[in-house]
Amino acid sequence: MAATNETKMEYTRLGKSGLKISKVILGAMSFGSSEWQDWVINEDEALPLLKHAYDVGLNTWDTADTYSNGRSEEIIGKALKKYSIPRNKVVILSKCYFGVADDGTQPPISASMVNDGAMVNQVGLSRKHILDAVDNSIARLGTYIDVLQIHRLDRDTPREEIMKALNDVVESGKVRYIGASSVSFNAW
Protein backbone atom coordinates (compact mmCIF):
# COMPACT_ATOMS: atom_id res chain seq x y z
CA MET A 1 0.00 0.00 0.00
CA ALA A 2 1.54 3.30 -1.04
CA ALA A 3 1.09 6.54 0.85
CA THR A 4 -2.30 8.09 0.13
CA ASN A 5 -3.93 11.49 0.50
CA GLU A 6 -5.25 10.23 3.85
CA THR A 7 -1.71 9.84 5.19
CA LYS A 8 -1.29 11.81 8.41
CA MET A 9 2.39 12.53 7.82
CA GLU A 10 3.26 16.20 7.58
CA TYR A 11 5.99 17.53 5.31
CA THR A 12 8.26 20.54 5.55
CA ARG A 13 10.88 22.25 3.42
CA LEU A 14 14.47 21.25 4.05
CA GLY A 15 16.21 24.45 5.06
CA LYS A 16 15.84 27.13 2.39
CA SER A 17 15.56 24.58 -0.43
CA GLY A 18 12.41 23.61 -2.28
CA LEU A 19 12.84 19.97 -1.21
CA LYS A 20 10.00 18.64 0.95
CA ILE A 21 10.79 16.02 3.57
CA SER A 22 8.64 14.25 6.13
CA LYS A 23 8.68 15.90 9.55
CA VAL A 24 9.66 12.51 10.93
CA ILE A 25 12.83 11.04 9.43
CA LEU A 26 13.65 7.34 9.52
CA GLY A 27 17.20 6.90 10.79
CA ALA A 28 18.87 3.78 9.40
CA MET A 29 21.97 3.70 11.58
CA SER A 30 20.55 0.61 13.27
CA PHE A 31 20.09 -1.30 9.97
CA GLY A 32 22.87 -3.64 8.89
CA SER A 33 24.92 -6.13 10.84
CA SER A 34 25.34 -6.79 14.55
CA GLU A 35 29.01 -7.43 13.75
CA TRP A 36 29.32 -3.64 13.51
CA GLN A 37 27.42 -2.87 16.74
CA ASP A 38 25.42 -5.33 18.83
CA TRP A 39 22.26 -3.17 18.75
CA VAL A 40 22.00 -3.23 14.94
CA ILE A 41 19.14 -5.19 13.34
CA ASN A 42 19.65 -7.36 10.28
CA GLU A 43 18.19 -7.02 6.80
CA ASP A 44 15.22 -9.34 7.44
CA GLU A 45 14.04 -7.10 10.28
CA ALA A 46 14.91 -3.79 8.61
CA LEU A 47 13.22 -4.32 5.23
CA PRO A 48 9.65 -4.48 6.60
CA LEU A 49 10.32 -1.33 8.65
CA LEU A 50 11.30 0.56 5.51
CA LYS A 51 8.18 -0.69 3.72
CA HIS A 52 5.96 0.37 6.62
CA ALA A 53 7.65 3.78 6.76
CA TYR A 54 6.90 4.27 3.07
CA ASP A 55 3.30 3.09 3.49
CA VAL A 56 2.59 5.67 6.21
CA GLY A 57 4.15 8.53 4.24
CA LEU A 58 7.48 8.69 6.03
CA ASN A 59 9.38 9.57 2.88
CA THR A 60 12.75 10.64 4.29
CA TRP A 61 15.37 8.01 5.13
CA ASP A 62 18.72 8.90 6.68
CA THR A 63 21.79 6.67 6.42
CA ALA A 64 25.57 6.94 6.04
CA ASP A 65 28.26 5.00 4.27
CA THR A 66 29.87 4.06 7.57
CA TYR A 67 26.72 2.56 9.13
CA SER A 68 27.42 -1.16 9.35
CA ASN A 69 30.27 -0.57 6.90
CA GLY A 70 27.86 0.17 4.04
CA ARG A 71 25.22 -2.45 4.84
CA SER A 72 22.65 0.19 5.86
CA GLU A 73 22.80 1.74 2.39
CA GLU A 74 22.54 -1.70 0.77
CA ILE A 75 19.39 -2.47 2.77
CA ILE A 76 17.75 0.78 1.68
CA GLY A 77 18.56 -0.07 -1.94
CA LYS A 78 17.08 -3.55 -1.49
CA ALA A 79 13.90 -2.12 0.03
CA LEU A 80 13.37 0.13 -2.99
CA LYS A 81 13.67 -2.88 -5.30
CA LYS A 82 11.89 -5.52 -3.22
CA TYR A 83 8.82 -3.38 -2.58
CA SER A 84 8.89 -1.55 -5.95
CA ILE A 85 9.01 1.79 -4.16
CA PRO A 86 9.13 4.56 -6.77
CA ARG A 87 12.45 6.35 -6.36
CA ASN A 88 10.84 9.76 -6.73
CA LYS A 89 8.64 9.05 -3.69
CA VAL A 90 11.46 8.90 -1.13
CA VAL A 91 14.21 11.27 -0.07
CA ILE A 92 17.48 9.50 0.74
CA LEU A 93 20.02 11.28 2.91
CA SER A 94 23.49 9.81 3.25
CA LYS A 95 26.76 10.99 4.70
CA CYS A 96 30.47 10.78 4.08
CA TYR A 97 33.58 11.31 6.17
CA PHE A 98 34.32 8.05 7.96
CA GLY A 99 36.03 5.15 6.27
CA VAL A 100 34.40 1.99 4.95
CA ALA A 101 36.55 -1.15 4.80
CA ASP A 102 37.01 -2.49 1.26
CA ASP A 103 37.10 -6.10 2.36
CA GLY A 104 33.61 -6.15 3.85
CA THR A 105 34.84 -6.47 7.42
CA GLN A 106 33.15 -4.46 10.13
CA PRO A 107 35.86 -2.17 11.55
CA PRO A 108 35.13 -0.49 14.87
CA ILE A 109 34.06 3.14 14.59
CA SER A 110 37.40 4.31 16.01
CA ALA A 111 39.29 2.55 13.19
CA SER A 112 37.15 4.26 10.55
CA MET A 113 38.29 7.69 11.76
CA VAL A 114 42.02 7.40 11.07
CA ASN A 115 43.20 8.65 7.65
CA ASP A 116 46.34 6.55 7.64
CA GLY A 117 47.60 3.05 6.98
CA ALA A 118 44.94 0.78 5.47
CA MET A 119 42.39 3.63 5.54
CA VAL A 120 44.55 6.35 3.96
CA ASN A 121 42.47 8.63 1.69
CA GLN A 122 39.33 6.74 2.75
CA VAL A 123 38.58 9.04 5.69
CA GLY A 124 37.88 12.75 5.76
CA LEU A 125 36.68 15.20 3.16
CA SER A 126 39.44 15.31 0.57
CA ARG A 127 38.18 15.59 -2.99
CA LYS A 128 39.34 12.02 -3.59
CA HIS A 129 37.42 10.64 -0.63
CA ILE A 130 34.22 12.60 -1.34
CA LEU A 131 34.11 11.47 -4.99
CA ASP A 132 34.95 7.85 -4.09
CA ALA A 133 32.47 7.81 -1.19
CA VAL A 134 29.64 9.09 -3.38
CA ASP A 135 30.34 6.52 -6.10
CA ASN A 136 30.45 3.73 -3.52
CA SER A 137 27.25 4.88 -1.81
CA ILE A 138 25.45 5.02 -5.15
CA ALA A 139 26.62 1.48 -5.91
CA ARG A 140 25.27 0.25 -2.57
CA LEU A 141 21.99 2.17 -2.82
CA GLY A 142 21.51 1.43 -6.50
CA THR A 143 20.42 5.02 -7.05
CA TYR A 144 21.38 8.67 -6.63
CA ILE A 145 21.57 10.48 -3.28
CA ASP A 146 19.06 13.23 -2.59
CA VAL A 147 21.04 14.89 0.20
CA LEU A 148 24.73 14.21 0.85
CA GLN A 149 25.85 15.42 4.25
CA ILE A 150 29.37 15.78 5.49
CA HIS A 151 29.43 13.70 8.68
CA ARG A 152 32.08 15.85 10.37
CA LEU A 153 34.19 18.87 9.49
CA ASP A 154 37.64 17.90 8.23
CA ARG A 155 40.12 20.44 9.54
CA ASP A 156 42.94 18.84 7.53
CA THR A 157 41.33 19.57 4.15
CA PRO A 158 40.97 23.12 2.82
CA ARG A 159 37.34 24.26 2.90
CA GLU A 160 37.60 25.31 -0.75
CA GLU A 161 38.51 21.74 -1.73
CA ILE A 162 35.59 20.36 0.28
CA MET A 163 33.07 22.79 -1.20
CA LYS A 164 34.33 22.32 -4.78
CA ALA A 165 34.05 18.53 -4.48
CA LEU A 166 30.54 18.82 -2.99
CA ASN A 167 29.51 21.18 -5.78
CA ASP A 168 30.92 18.79 -8.37
CA VAL A 169 28.90 15.80 -7.11
CA VAL A 170 25.76 17.93 -7.34
CA GLU A 171 26.69 19.17 -10.82
CA SER A 172 27.29 15.55 -11.90
CA GLY A 173 23.73 14.58 -10.95
CA LYS A 174 24.87 11.96 -8.45
CA VAL A 175 23.67 14.13 -5.55
CA ARG A 176 20.77 16.60 -5.51
CA TYR A 177 21.56 18.66 -2.39
CA ILE A 178 24.35 18.98 0.17
CA GLY A 179 24.27 19.45 3.91
CA ALA A 180 26.17 18.87 7.13
CA SER A 181 25.66 16.59 10.11
CA SER A 182 27.35 16.88 13.51
CA VAL A 183 28.92 20.21 12.54
CA SER A 184 28.38 23.37 14.55
CA PHE A 185 27.64 26.57 12.66
CA ASN A 186 30.73 28.18 14.20
CA ALA A 187 32.98 25.43 12.82
CA TRP A 188 33.10 27.16 9.44
PLM feature spans:
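N-terminal binding-site loop/beta-alpha segment at the start of enzyme catalytic domains
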Residues: M1-V91, V100
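Conserved beta-strand positions
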Residues: L26, T63, S94, V147-I150, ...
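Beta-hairpin (beta-strand-turn-beta-strand) motif
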Residues: T66, K95-Y97, L153
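Generic beta-strand or strand-like secondary-structure segments
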Residues: I75-A79, V91, K95, H129, ...
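Eukaryotic helix-linker segments that join adjacent hydrophobic helices
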Residues: S84, K95, A101-N115
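Glycine-rich beta-alpha junction loops
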Residues: C96-F98, S184-F185
